[in-house]
C-alpha cells in the first residue's frame, strides 16, 4: 500500500496493488471466491473511445517498469506477441481518465475509489472503448475493451469507480 500527498501535504490517494500469479498455485484447500463485479442488465450509460498511443509506453517507462516487453519489438516478437504491450498502470490510468471525463468532468479530486482487474494486455495503437454503467449516487461499474473487436476478452474487467458526488 502506498499513499500519495500533494506539495502542501494533503492526502491525494492510497494505492493498493495485488499480484496475481496465474500459473502458480497448488497450495491445497479451497480456491478463494472470484472478485467479480455485477454489471447492470442494460445498455451502458456512457462510452468513451480513444486510441492508445504508440509512444505512451515511453511516457510510463520512468514510473519504474523497465521491462523490455513494453518497448522492444524484437523481444516481444520472441514471446509471441505482435508488438510491445502497455504498462498496466498506464491502462488503468487511461480508464481512470475516461471515468473522470464521463462521470465527474473537471473534478478528479472527487474520485475516492478505483478498482479493476487486468484481464488482457493492451497493445499500443489499439482503439480502446471504456464502457460505464452508473449504478448509484457516486458509484459506477466499467470495463475496457478493444473498440474494433468488442466481443474479444476485455483488457480491464470488474471495474468499480466511486466518487464524492457532493464535489462533482
Language-model features: locations:
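Histidine (H) residue identity feature
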Residues: 11, 67-70, 87, 98, ...
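Catalytic strand-loop segment that frames the active site of acyl-thioester-processing enzymes
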Residues: 19-86, 100
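HotDog/MaoC-like acyl-thioester-processing domains
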Residues: 1-48, 124, 131-168
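Hydrophobic beta-strand-centered segment that forms part of the acyl-chain substrate-binding groove
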Residues: 91-135, 139
